[in-house]
């Protein structure tokens, strides 16, 4: 087998390459150790000079790793082990380094981060929360500062100036959420100097599976512009609560989909007084009903969300942490609020959005590290073009992983778990109990209280003391009940006495749908060669077992007298559980892949719009571009009147003139001026007249103001239509799956119709830019004229810079600018 591995196993070949380089780095150790602190620091400038003179990162890699390794020892007293060098090389190569818990991923990242920061293009280190970002920046940051590099931390509460400084640092620590929101905000600014990011170069994502897999289905959204809909959610909720399963609605355990059956459809039509529920005019009603069904029958309180202070707070299904400030999209959050009887927030309009999949694929080089990635390596390779390299442990793993204990019922399982905890607690062995849901952790806690066993509970309702609770979880006699949140971030360290007692005992109360999450729980025990054990207890009533049909096995065991309190350890049943997990993982991968295919459609559009915005912001003047827009619009205007035979009739010319004289020109053109002219000549004549009047208007205004004026109008038009387009695409996406009933591929239909909508949007943008710029007047006061001349000063004797005041001429039949939706003549123009 080893012979075949040498030729066909990518991971094996990469590790062999890394070992050769790691040997060279280790050989340099005696030389680097002899350098003084000053000589070691000077190496950074030497490396930068060599890069400037044409050498590449591969040429300085061995020396740079050796320097970073020695600096770590001098600054924090820790020198990366040989296996950590291997991990660092995997990360530098744009791979994922899979390193077991306690193997020192944080220290491992310092070597590739230092090497890549030498280019001056910036390195971003992403963590899952701000606590870890600050901890790692303060801890590892001292190594980089010692070597002459700058280190920044980007927080949610940082000011724009602080964010700019952080992004301009050689190495920046931040969270995946803040990175994404900064990207979206940068593409909404109206001045170039307000952007905080620079081009995305190299990123190291800590807990990469959490960011790129678990959160891949959750888009980042910046929203605004409120929509009134609270009563509709209440009405839909009332209706949904009247229905019964299989007698009004159907619930699919495997997919968690809830749909109306025939009876439910008829009841909906009666309740809401509509003839045909699925008529196109009832699209919104169907949406509210569907969300109410999902809220009431698929979303579980204290598992998917908690209710706190009149608010619905989402529970992260993979970490168990509360996600304050996050809302379910598409009205599901409001539907849950209606279900729970809390205040219903107003729905908002999406202003900007992106998925983590497309955000991180914008980096020149993407890498990561985690303890659990191997089960998802196909997805990492296919979506992100990253390989998972499993790094050997520094010491052999001494933890004992036992096969699953299977019980008939949950009640029997929980009793057995409490008895096991009691036995281990009496021995003094620390126990970590892993649960999936808040309600399970609270149930186990109440049973332990009755048994008079002291313990700590760590769940979404009680996460303020997370670091403290986890740090003490390895003490003698400690019993800790935790949701999945205990899986990341803080090591559980053991005393010698606890090691003698067998180390940390990990008990899982049920299998998660992802093997990776189970492996994370196991990995809390047995760090760096410590002793320990792990055991999962499952029952036929667990969600995973119910979803994947284990009724036949349950019946068989019942026939042979398998009672509630008896457990069995059966390899065949354990394999069937793992097979069920693989099916769920495969299904989830397909969902994420499908999401990406749809998101790629709007991502191409987003890239063009954002590129156009940045060109506008970075240009000194966009006047030539504005004139091109005028020409495009006038050309489209004329083309839209051309007869199929390829000419313009007198009637067509009259229509073009009527529109032009009313909307584009102050000085009217006559039909005679256009008669007997070719289509190109008509276009050019109209264009020349529009330009003549427009240039005349601008000639009366100082050049600096006209530059600002054009930029402000163009950006406002682009942003307005782009935001509308995002919501239009979202609406298209919501119903596109119905096309499959007509034998039409939904993705192909979404792509085709999405680009038609996009083309329409671009044409509308050209039209509105033309209209706004031609119709707008710029008023300036005396102070503004003085500003342009550099004369106006404020109390501190500094020149003031004001923004141009733009006033639009509004036609009486145009929408009122107050946002009421009425015509101007029927609203503010009365």
Feature locations, PLM:
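Short Cys/His-rich zinc-binding micro-motifs
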Residues: 806-825, 829
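Active-site-adjacent structural elements in folded domains
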Residues: 109, 417, 801-803, 811
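Extended, charged helical/alpha-beta scaffold domains that provide interaction surfaces
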Residues: 32, 306-313, 319-326, 528-529, ...
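Hydrophobic, well-ordered secondary-structure elements that form the walls
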Residues: 433, 481, 722, 758, ...
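Short, Lys/Glu-rich amphipathic helical modules
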Residues: 428-441, 618-619, 671-675, 817
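Conserved P-loop NTPase motor core
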Residues: 1-561, 610-611
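Generic detector of short, well-ordered, non-transmembrane alpha-helical segments enriched
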Residues: 376, 429, 477, 605, ...
